[in-house]
């Protein structure tokens, strides 16, 4: 069976993996000042990850009030305003990183500013045959 794990090769020939860091937080729990400080810290983290070659992509998301959910059941599309689940913490952003292993991904996740008051979920990224693959520099592979 072909290895389908989300791995990249580094310059030393070692295996690298892509991880998605999903940032969950309670949007209402942050003041405007705390949010601005969080964005500044996140920008610094992104610059640091970029300098070490671990940054692939990152972005905050607009508030959950702007979300639209789409479901298809029995061939019929249902579009609703808002998120699928009603929970206190909502998906607020993400980082896509290149890490040597889960331990390295955890060390990066603990530096994500919203981890101080929210949750950062770490998920390995799976590559599927037939889909374009991303190089470690964040660009699609030709």
Where would I find each of the regions flagged by the language model?
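Conserved, structured core segments of small domains
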Residues: 8-142
